[in-house]
Structure formats: C-alpha cells, structure tokens
Amino acid sequence: MTTRLQAPVAVTPPLPTRRNAELLLLCFAAVITFAALLVVQANQDQGVPWDLTSYGLAFLTLFGSAHLAIRRFAPYTDPLLLPVVALLNGLGLVMIHRLDLVDNEIGEHRHPSANQQMLWTLVGVAAFALVVTFLKDHRQLARYGYICGLAGLVFLAVPALLPAALSEQNGAKIWIRLPGFSIQPAEFSKILLLIFFSAVLVAKRGLFTSAGKHLLGMTLPRPRDLAPLLAAWVISVGVMVFEKDLGASLLLYTSFLVVVYLATQRFSWVVIGLTLFAAGTLVAYFIFEHVRLRVQTWLDPFADPDGTGYQIVQSLFSFATGGIFGTGLGNGQPDTVPAASTDFIIAAFGEELGLVGLTAILMLYTIVIIRGLRTAIATRDSFGKLLAAGLSSTLAIQLFIVVGGVTRLIPLTGLTTPWMSYGGSSLLANYILLAILARISHGARRPLRTRPRNKSPITAAGTEVIERV
C-alpha cells in the first residue's frame, strides 16, 4: 500500500474591490442632488412636483446601472471615479433646472433643458457601461492608434469644411448640425487623438528621445525629429484660425505637449512647443480679426460692456455678487449671464454657492484628476500610463481653460465644463473618457495572476510508505 502526503496549499484572500463603498457614495451623491433640487424649489416658491421626484429616481437608477456594469466587468476600478462624476453631473442638472424655472417665468422656451440634459445623461451613462463591458483590455486601443488619429483629424476638419449655416454658432465653426440635434466633434477628437499620441509615443519613443544639441541646460531634439511637434502645431493653429475655436486649439495642443513630456521626460519639448504656439498666436493676432477681438475683449472687457465684453462683464458681476458664501441656490440671478447653462455654468455656481461652494466643486474635479494620475502611476504598461495621464491631464487643462476664461485669467474660449454644462456632445464624450479611465484603473488595481512554483521545501514533499505483504 502506498500513501502520498500532499503539501498544504496556501490560499491568498482576494483583494477588496470596494464596490460596496462605491455604491454607498453613489447613494450619497443622489441624496445631495435631490436635496439641492429641493432647496431650489423652496427658494423659488415652487412645490415638489412628480417631475422633480422622477429626476431623483432616474438619477439613482442610471448610476446604479453603471455601478452594476463596473461590479460585473471591472470590479477593481477606483471606487471614487463614478460617484464623484455622478455628483458633478447631478449638480449640473440642478443648476440647469434652476435656470429652467427662470426661463419658464418669462416664456422663453417650452421644453425644459433639464429634461434634455437628463436624456443625454442616459445616453452618456449607457455609453459608459458599453465601453466598460466590451473593452476587455485598454491595450487593445493601441492597435487602432493610427485609425483613431485619422478619425480625430476628420472630426476636427469636417466643421471647417461645412457651410456656416451647418457648422457656425456664436462665431465658431465647431458644430455639425443635423435634423433635430447638433454634434460638436472636437469633444470626441480629444479622446481619439490622445489614443493616437499615446500609441505613437510608445511605438516611436526613440524618435522623441534622440539626443541633440544642448542649450541653457536643456537637451534639444534633432531638427529632423521635430516633425510630429510641427504637425500638432499646424493642426492646433489651423483649428484656431479656420474654426475660430481657441479653446479646442489650446486643449489639443497642450494635451499633446503633456503626453510628450511624460514619455520623454525632456522639458525642451515643452519649451519648443509653447514657443511655437505663442508665435502662431501672435501671427494670428495681427492677421485675423476674430483672434484680435478675442484678445482685446480679454484685456479690457469694460471698453464695450454692452457689446463684445458683455459676457465676461456679467460673469465678473456674478462672482462679485456671490462673494464668499453665495446667495443660495435659487436666490441669485445667474440668468443675467449669457449661456449660463453652457459656457458660464461656473459663474452661475459662483454666484449662488459663493467662493466656498465653487471651491468644493473644484475639489471634486481635483479628486477625479488625482485618482486618474494615480491610476497612471500604478498601471504596468507604458501605453496605459500615457493614456491615463493624458486623459487626466486633459480634464485638468480643460477645467483650467474654463475657469480661467470666466474669471478673466485667460481669454474666453467657449469650452464646456465637463459633466456639468448643458450639451450632449460634451456629456457623451466625457463619459467615454471616464469609461476608458475606469478600465485602465481596473487593470492597474487588479491582482496579478502568478503560477505556483514547482519547487517546494523538503518538509512539504510527498512521502511514500511501502508495506510488505
């Protein structure tokens, strides 16, 4: 008879996925959103109609579905990403609903913008769930880097080629108008081009790290290696000139510079890139009237407070009215600012929530950005690192451009505030961005699968007992 004693098997407990914490935070975001709606209704002397209750139920159902998609297909995703974005989206809905109440009093439109924004939120969350479900590995995107780059360029170019009646609004040719709705393709271009930049920088890293001459302590790239930077410069200046969209131009170009710097760790690329952009902007200032007008309005908006400077002047008055603590939700007059639900929603929050409330909102964005950068640090592959860092940096740059524009720190650009401003294109694109970031986060936090070693200590080895019969 032979008896074989097996070695004990060590069982490692699975790492916590923290999905229950995410669900709890989502419920907290829903409570804050609904409470803010009640405050608006109370301060506007409104009742609590069924529509308001349906907003809260729909909000909780939508993000509960997104939570289930993450729990099933990406359980190791950072638990803070979705709840923080849900809260930002909810606060945006509250402000849009608050502006609807004013519009209804003066009879400007029949269809509330909050209902349309809720519909776009449904589309955005559905897109988020689809990306989380079907994008099994973020590294698959690197295979389609050149296709994404070509698609991103096409999306940028189409509005410039269309007639003004189909693409121009408020002086910028950035739209594609279709029957029943409009699309702003630049919102999707920023994601597609970031995928392209990340894939190319991983595959062609040597092209960007080749040593050249030294100047002022910096290692300059070789002249023949400047082609990618010059191409990005031409594209960004072309968008600024032909589509009259300074915001998209600045966002795309600075995002490219950030990714290049992260890939090469050479500050010379940033210096050369910013010098080229400044030179292009200076030339455009003297040649093109719309660029010159935008800069002059930024420098002195009170020179024409009822004309070209009206938007920024009203925005500054809103911040001044809000002060430190704000007038309270529903108690201010944010409707006096043009485009308060889109380009100037930050000014609307600044008036009714004050500096304290606006700082809290900016801290929510900071949480998303920092968690995205932490994901980039934790990711094991180079493509994922660059893409996660690029997506997070794009959010940071866009937020800086928006806040800087409405506070007159930089020229007004017309970019929307992610997840808060009214608009389907921005909402849909940013939920896709969040889904990709969530997928990268899942890959970074997921425990590695390791095969057990064949070697075992002598004490755990099998023994044989041979019995004579």
Curated annotation (Swiss-Prot):
Catalytic activity: [GlcNAc-(1->4)-Mur2Ac(oyl-L-Ala-gamma-D-Glu-L-Lys-D-Ala-D-Ala)](n)-di-trans,octa-cis-undecaprenyl diphosphate + beta-D-GlcNAc-(1->4)-Mur2Ac(oyl-L-Ala-gamma-D-Glu-L-Lys-D-Ala-D-Ala)-di-trans,octa-cis-undecaprenyl diphosphate = [GlcNAc-(1->4)-Mur2Ac(oyl-L-Ala-gamma-D-Glu-L-Lys-D-Ala-D-Ala)](n+1)-di-trans,octa-cis-undecaprenyl diphosphate + di-trans,octa-cis-undecaprenyl diphosphate + H(+)
Chief site of localization: membrane
Transmembrane segments: 20-40, 50-70, 76-96, 115-135, 146-166, 183-203, 226-246, 248-264, 267-287, 312-332, 344-364, 386-406, 418-438
PANTHER family reported for this sequence: CELL CYCLE PROTEIN, PEPTIDOGLYCAN GLYCOSYLTRANSFERASE RODA
The protein's role, per its UniProt record: Transglycosylase involved in peptidoglycan cell wall formation. Required for the regulation of cell length. Plays critical roles for the survival of the pathogen inside the host. Required for both bacterial survival and formation of granuloma structures in a guinea pig infection model.
Phosphothreonine PTM sites in chain numbering: 463
Upper taxonomic lineage: Bacteria, Bacillati, Actinomycetota, Actinomycetes, Mycobacteriales
Effect of deleting the gene: Deletion of the gene does not impact in vitro growth, but it leads to aberrations in the cell length. Deletion enhances sensitivity to nisin and vancomycin. Also exhibits hypersensitivity to moenomycin. Mutant shows compromised bacterial virulence in the host.
Annotated PROSITE patterns: FTSW_RODA_SPOVE
A molecular-function term among this protein's GO annotations: lipid-linked peptidoglycan transporter activity
Protein name: Peptidoglycan glycosyltransferase RodA
UniProt record, GO biological process: cell division; cell wall organization; peptidoglycan biosynthetic process; regulation of cell shape; symbiont-mediated perturbation of host innate immune response
Keywords, alphabetical: Cell inner membrane, Cell membrane, Cell shape, Cell wall biogenesis/degradation, Glycosyltransferase, Membrane, Peptidoglycan synthesis, Phosphoprotein, Transferase, Transmembrane, Transmembrane helix
Database matches in InterPro entries: Cell_cycle_FtsW-rel_CS, FtsW/RodA
Pfam families xref list: FTSW_RODA_SPOVE (PF01098)
Family: Belongs to the SEDS family.
Pathway entry: Cell wall biogenesis; peptidoglycan biosynthesis
Entry EC no(s): 2.4.99.28
Compartments, record wording: Cell inner membrane
Modes of activity regulation: Phosphorylation at Thr-463 may be important for modulating interactions with other cell division proteins, thus regulating the cell division process.
Membrane topology: Multi-pass membrane protein
Modifications made to the protein after synthesis: Phosphorylated on Thr-463, probably by PknB and PknH.
Key word Cell membrane present: yes
Gene Ontology cellular-component terms listed: cell division site; plasma membrane
